[in-house]
A protein has these predicted regions:
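Glycine-rich portal/gate segments that line the openings of hydrophobic small-molecule binding cavities
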Residues: 42-96
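Hydrophobic pocket/interface hotspot
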Residues: 20, 30, 54-56, 84, ...
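Short, surface-exposed coil-to-beta transition loops
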Residues: 8, 41, 77-81, 107-112
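A generic structural micro-feature
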Residues: 3, 48, 73-78, 104-108, ...
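Beta-strand/loop substructures that line and gate deep hydrophobic ligand-binding cavities in soluble
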Residues: 85-86, 92-146
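Hydrophobic ligand-binding cavity/cleft-lining segments
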Residues: 1-41, 45
Length: 164
């Protein structure tokens, strides 16, 4: 596994802590924003408690993404599973995904830690992403995650953004 440092993504939204928390911990919330632009998810299981399981399909649904996936010889959807390993309601969660859908790459775990910090009418969301198996995949991970955050910016409006 890569010795690269964790990636840090921070956004501040004009939303409530409960609204953002529900996006991470409910089926409807998760399906409403998870996945980069051009993709959607279908949640099959979400048990948002310590040790609980998250299972979903990531599905290319925009014509340009479908064409790109087909051109690369990649499937249009893949099954994803993870485990909630830490939950402090409306404050912090840790979600560990099993990365077992990359051709030619041994399965491994990728962890993300999400924290919420209320500030007046806004909430700052800080997400720490563990690096993927190589720098290029880590770059793509950050790009994809940043893309899906655009869905939240459209929904709530973003006050301030930062990534490292």
């Amino acid at each position: 596994m890569s010795e690269a440092k964790n990636l840090l993504v921070e956004r501040t939204y004009r939303a409530t802590v409960q609204e953002l928390w529900d996006l991470w911990t409910t089926k409807d919330g998760f399906e409403s924003w998870w996945g980069p632009e051009g993709f959607r998810v279908e949640v099959h299981e979400m048990d948002a408690r310590v040790g609980g399981t998250l299972r979903y399909d990531m599905i290319a649904d925009a014509p340009e993404m479908i064409a790109a996936m087909e051109k690369m010889g990649q499937p249009l959807s893949h099954k994803t599973r993870g485990t909630f390993s830490q939950l402090e309601p409306q404050r912090r969660l840790t979600l560990t995904h099993v990365i077992d859908f990359l051709p030619g790459v041994e399965p491994y775990e990728s962890t993300m830690v999400m924290e919420l910090f209320p500030s007046g009418a806004n909430v700052r969301m800080v997400v720490q992403l563990s690096p993927m198996h190589n720098p290029e995949m880590s770059r793509m991970q950050l790009e994809g995650f940043t893309s899906q955050l655009g869905k939240l910016e459209k929904r709530f409006g973003a006050a301030v953004s930062a990534s490292t």
